[in-house]
Curated annotation (Swiss-Prot):
Homodimer. GO terms for molecular function: rRNA (pseudouridine-N3-)-methyltransferase activity. Its EC number is 2.1.1.177. This is Ribosomal RNA large subunit methyltransferase H. GO terms for cellular component: cytoplasm. CDD domains: RlmH-like. It is found in: Cytoplasm. InterPro entries: Alpha/beta_knot_MTases, RlmH-like, tRNA_m1G_MTases_N. Keywords: Cytoplasm, Methyltransferase, rRNA processing, S-adenosyl-L-methionine, Transferase. It comes from Pseudomonas putida (strain W619).
Amino acid sequence: MRLRLIAVGSRMPKWVEEGWHEYAKRLPQELSLELVEIPLNTRGKNADVARLIRQEGEAMLSKVQPGERIVTLEVHGKPWSTEQLATELDRWRLDSRTVNLMVGGPEGLAPEVCARAEQRWSLSPLTLPHPLVRILIGEQIYRAWTVLSGHPYHK
C-alpha cells in the first residue's frame, strides 16, 4: 500500500523532517509513506491569493495519477478517532489504490482539489501549524497501523 502526503510548503526545519522520517521509517515495507512537497508561492502585499491557491492546487493534482484516491485534510472535514483512522487505513489497503493525503497552504486547498476528494479528514477544529501537521499525520498513520497489527504502541 502506498500513502503519499502531498503538502504545500518546503524547506521545513530539521526537527520537522526528523519527526516525519521517524514515523515513516517505523512502518512496514508493505505500507510506504511518502512526502511530496509543493513549493509555496510567494505571497506579497498585493498578491492575487486566489490565483496562487489555484496554481498550488494544479501543482498538487499534477502529482496524482488517474484512479488514485484523494483525501483532503481540511477544517470542515470529518474528524476520525484513532480507531476510525485504522478502519480507513484497512479499507484503503483492501482497495489497493495509492492514497494521496492533501494539505494546502496557509489559505487552504484549491476548490479543484477539494472537488476531487473522495474523503475529507479534519485533524482538529484548531488551526494547526503546517510543519506540525506533517508530523501529526505521520504519527497518526503509524498509530493506526499499530492498532491494525496489534502492536502495543497505541495502548
